[in-house]
Curated annotation (Swiss-Prot):
The gene is TGA1. It is found in: Nucleus. This is Transcription factor TGA1. Residues 82-145 form the bZIP domain. It comes from Arabidopsis thaliana. Keywords: Activator, Coiled coil, Disulfide bond, DNA-binding, Nucleus, Transcription, Transcription regulation. GO terms for molecular function: DNA-binding transcription factor activity; sequence-specific DNA binding; transcription cis-regulatory region binding.
Amino acid sequence: MNSTSTHFVPPRRVGIYEPVHQFGMWGESFKSNISNGTMNTPNHIIIPNNQKLDNNVSEDTSHGTAGTPHMFDQEASTSRHPDKIQRRLAQNREAARKSRLRKKAYVQQLETSRLKLIQLEQELDRARQQGFYVGNGIDTNSLGFSETMNPGIAAFEMEYGHWVEEQNRQICELRTVLHGHINDIELRSLVENAMKHYFELFRMKSSAAKADVFFVMSGMWRTSAERFFLWIGGFRPSDLLKVLLPHFDVLTDQQLLDVCNLKQSCQQAEDALTQGMEKLQHTLADCVAAGQLGEGSYIPQVNSAMDRLEALVSFVNQADHLRHETLQQMYRILTTRQAARGLLALGEYFQRLRALSSSWATRHREPT
């Protein structure tokens, strides 16, 4: 046992040694100890507790593990300072939270800027359609920019843009299912969604009419070809029936009778609303024209006309109510598949009008 210890040389006296040879000596030492039934450790490999750090470094370096003590020191340091670790983790979490908040604010700012840009583009298009140009010396405030833009109308235009996108999606869906195989239950769900989509448009128009009834009446939110067929802020229900009838499958005698009665009722209601509008126009004209020539003050006439304009909002709502009831009655008269074909025909009709408007607008820009 003593002879085994003489093979080891204290590390301080040897700088570099052969690892293979050293491992061989370790193996012989352990074998001899185990064969004698004892496990004596040579005195020179027992490291005193008070040995300096540089001795450990030199010994580990000689065994090819110079970086290990530094790693152990870091682990010991972190284990001795848990509060410091928690503070650093808390700082990192706070920095990440602030970064997310800055990113969210930046995205919101971009979205706000995008909406403002869309609003300005719509206002410019509306100004061009009305024939107002800044170059002609008209004040920019009269063009309806954000300083004087009615927020209710701006919201309506945004909603209507989304409404048209959703309508186009529903038209594509109806076209696909009608050319494929679908049961009546699923088809009924699509038809009801399309009906509700039109009812949502009537609700939007009612809110917009309260904000600016002249805007709704003028149809500035529609394309030029659609405005050509405008009647009290929308389509005539009787014209709707003319568009739909050729696209239905063979109707029964009872269905034909119901459709004819509905068409007659629509025309009577349209005539009544048209006469009421004409009477209102005459009343407004009389109110505005009243007063002495050269009076200079129009306040009494304007106030009198303002009181009568509330009736104009009622006319818009009544016209949309007639459109709503016409769609609802057609839905009751027709089968589910016939109603789906009718809604597809109606949607494609408005798509063609919008396409006609775009073609007409680009025609003027083409070189001659």
